[in-house]
From Swiss-Prot:
It comes from the Bacteria. Its EC number is 2.8.1.8. [4Fe-4S] cluster 1 binds at C41, C46, C52, S281. Binds 2 [4Fe-4S] clusters per subunit. One cluster is coordinated with 3 cysteines and an exchangeable S-adenosyl-L-methionine. It comes from Staphylococcus carnosus (strain TM300). SUPFAM superfamilies: Radical SAM enzymes. One of its GO terms (cellular component) is cytoplasm. This is Lipoyl synthase. Residues 285-310 are annotated as: Disordered. SMART domains: Elp3. Its main location: cytoplasm. Residues 54-270 form the Radical SAM core domain.
Length: 310
């Protein structure tokens, strides 16, 4: 059996990153703990956390608790029986977004299959509270498939996020092994219905590579996402969070990611981020529509003016 050290040595150079723990990052992490908030950036061990928090004014909050009712074999988030919903969470998230001066916030959530509404009402309330308190911050939501509950999806979309993100994660053949509690077709239907409910809101999905898929299967998944009218695609390298999770079957090179991005753009995606360290929320602030970008611009101007007055 390979040792932990051997696994690290097998990783190619392009997956080795230099962590830049600046003052902004350290302060934000302290505030998260003080407010009993969770970010998927930390829980999922995202390699881009220092860039997003420290430089891009982007963060991904994980709501509805820190324990997921599912146990997908690629994911580092804790699984088990969740706690009761925290009804004060929407206000705390909104306050934290304000204190962090975020340009773009991604609000994701653990799957709450234990709840009748899958947590959609608290989720939508979080979006509304963030919007009320931070009118210039763009908001992306990244929900589970809500167990196929499309009333829950309608509740979410009525909160008018700037992007709806729902990840297909892998190709059709591998879906039962990678995320047994979800289905490939339910993900596509969730994305398709999201666009039908709010045609002006961009939809987005993400694929992990390195789980044993073929290039042809990746192209087919791109076609399936475009058929569901998905606008934005991110493609990143799967990295095994622990020995309990699925093993990496292949490390894709930056050149291979470049080729995948080229194919995706040729297939009609409006945006595609593809690279070894790309994750679903990577450079998400750039992917909103023009009206949302104008709000970001106004917010940036107000923030700069406030700094100059200080």
């Amino acid at each position: 059996m390979a040792t932990k050290n051997e696994e690290i040595l097998r990783k190619p150079d392009w997956l080795k990153i230099k962590l830049n723990t600046n003052e902004n990052y350290t302060g934000l992490k302290k505030m998260m703990r003080e407010k009993n908030l969770h970010t998927v950036c930390e829980e999922a061990k995202c390699p881009n956390i220092h860039e997003c928090w420290g430089e891009r004014r982007t963060a991904t909050f994980m709501i509805l608790g820190a324990v997921c009712t599912r146990a997908c074999r690629f994911c580092a988030v804790k699984t088990g029986l969740p706690n009761e919903l925290d009804l004060g969470e929407p206000e705390r998230v909104a306050e934290s977004v304000e204190l962090m001066n975020l340009k773009h916030v991604v609000i994701t959530a653990v799957a709450r299959d234990d709840l009748r509404d899958a947590g959609s009402n608290v989720y939508a309330e979080t979006v509304r509270k963030v919007r009320e308190r931070n009118p210039y911050t763009t908001i992306e939501i990244l929900p589970s498939d809500m167990g196929g509950d499309y009333d829950a999806l309608e509740t979410l979309m009525a909160s008018k996020p700037d992007i709806l993100n729902h990840n297909i994660e892998t190709v059709r053949r591998l879906t039962p092994r990678v995320r047994a509690r979800a289905t490939y077709d339910r993900t596509l239907e969730f994305l398709r219905r999201s666009k039908e409910l709010q045609p002006d809101i961009p939809t987005k999905s993400s694929i992990m590579v390195g789980l044993g898929e073929t290039i042809e299967e990746l192209h087919e998944t791109m076609d399936d996402l475009r058929a569901a009218d998905v606008d934005i695609l991110t493609i990143g390298q799967y990295l095994q969070p622990s020995r309990k999770h699925l093993k990496v079957q292949k490390y894709y090179s930056p050149l291979e990611f470049g080729k995948l991005r080229k194919v995706a753009m040729e297939k009609g995606f409006k945006h595609c981020q593809a690279g070894p360290l790309v994750r679903s929320s990577y450079h998400a602030d750039e992917q909103v529509n023009e009206a949302a970008k104008e709000r970001q611009r106004i917010g940036d101007e107000k923030l700069e003016a406030a700094k100059n007055e200080a």
